[in-house]
């Protein structure tokens, strides 16, 4: 006979659990057992010169630990030392050693040593190759017993659907008896990785996770098949190395059954039910089924407890599997954050697929341009934008229309175009005079009709108009504007436990947001982010001096020189004063020259 059993200890080696036809997984340690039956070979009329077995195994998928092949008799006694053993090209040869043999016909003793050095060649000999007068035979006291050749194998390659076959042949002198062939279908199993926002939610693999938002890494275990050749599960868990530059693990985790879980044939937890987690009450299971720990370097380790391993080991009738969620927070902008996890079952590691998320720079910002309305209408924004005193407008009157153009310049997610929004009614426009005494009348600004409901999305602009009043003849004027606003961004869920004790992960609960008050616009939940200020923008203008009367022509030269001197002196003082205020860009100029 010839059977196969799975085991991990010496105790098991002496038990024959027939696993013919059962499924083998990568890393499984199985013991093929080849039987040599010499029980009926006593009192034969001839000497038994050769006794052993040849076992042809599938070396592409199985690796034999030839050093630990053992031969046991029917009492379980180790008889390995009495046999020669060789492993060659996927075939194991085990033959009883030749011993010093007395030849009655000659009265001589033929030495048993040296032993055959090539057991393949030895196994292929026939009776014709054996000379009973010159060749040694085996120890005849081995006869009358049965032996078991125990071959420790490891499944080192799997291919779904492939069946490994193992056929042994007993060799007694010239007689060859094929034993039954043992077959084991191989099953390829693999863990998978995903990333999502909520338990059971759609995958966001390849998509964006926004800065300071929480999300879930999803770690699906392999699915253990029923009818396993190696039924005992000694360990089941894995590690996930987070990139702490981008991902902060928040300490919240949960495990759900991905297949029904049984105890003593009764369902203990249904597929999709939460069976472990941070702060989870596991009393119904008689204790924790999983532990999850993280080190300071962002390596998260999950392990099934002995309680869970015992449940799975005891049930070889059903599939087994689980899914772990880890709550993380994205803490930096990134083009690409890859993540995988490594699952280990019975000491055999398996790598998952890779998921990738990105975090676009979506910094909220607003931009302000301040222009004079007449030039804007006639020549366009560029001509009307008088940031520099050299571009100052020569004004014909003491007042002029001013237009403030406010643009949402927030950075966006290239994939979706999403970015911060600004409610126009939240914008606060401020204008102050830098040079001169005139000012923009901020109490009589004109806003668009839909100002109270208007929302500026990225790239959109709005114009507010007002009037600059009080520029006197001969005076230069500079005023500076700035706008502040509160950006509205997609609400970031809080760092609280997203799983709570509901089996669905609490998707029906109202999310608590970690950022500001919630505003709903176009069905989107938006939250207030930190207030943002625009650039400052200047506008420059001047009015010419009134023409001097002709009666002072004689004094013109001296008077003119004195005026320039006085003006120059006052300009220097003025310059100094403004530099002292840190406003080096805005120097007074005699724009009337």
Regions found by a protein language model. Give the residues of each.
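Extracellular Ser/Thr-rich, low-complexity/disordered mucin-like segments
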Residues: 542-559
